[in-house]
Amino acid sequence: MLSLEDGTLAVKTARNVIEEYVKTGNYSKFELPKTFDRPGGVFVTLSINHDLRGCIGYPYPMEDMSLGEALADAAMSAATRDPRFPRVHKNELDQIRVEVTILGQPELLKCKPLERPHHIKIGRDGLIIEYGLHKGLLLPQVPVEWHWDATEFLENLCLKAGISPDAWVEEKAKIYTFGGQIFEETEPGGPVIEKKIA
């Protein structure tokens, strides 16, 4: 668990990386506390007026990358490499709110496929699906924002992976749950809070 101080530092680091990269095409080396030296999963989400503007990250800890390095890469990628959106332009920087989700270790959901909705807690769990070559991930805050129940969460997870919305009922579909700590700006460039969604 990160403290609010560390979470604030994570969000401010993400913003600094984004602003510098969008303006110059590069970003400077930065220093973070030892908390960020370990490997860890992280996502950076950008929004303008509560509309998604970019979201990229690492669902699993990377052996060759610290949490701090993953954070910086996810921030830069959310601004410039999300295939759903054009690159963030420097004119947008003062409109963008930055959110950082630090992910817990994903755990395989071990139950019969039709029982999966009963083992998912909205507001606590994020989901990952692996279905053959298809993979998809939805962060814990997504079903809360869209007012989905657990079944709708699973269906939309399948759609995110590019498969049929009912593929989650198949044995070959592997579903993983994970927790997350969410830190976000209250306004673009403003104070950072830990977002509670449960």
Swiss-Prot record:
InterPro entries: AMMECR1, AMMECR1_dom_sf, AMMECR1_domain, AMMECR1_N, AmmeMemoSam_A, Uncharacterised_MJ0810. Gene3D superfamilies: Hypothetical protein ph0010, domain 1, Hypothetical protein ph0010, domain 2. Residues 5-194 form the AMMECR1 domain. SUPFAM superfamilies: AMMECR1-like. It comes from the Archaea. HAMAP family: AMMECR1. This is Protein UNCMA_24250. It comes from Methanocella arvoryzae (strain DSM 22066 / NBRC 105507 / MRE50).
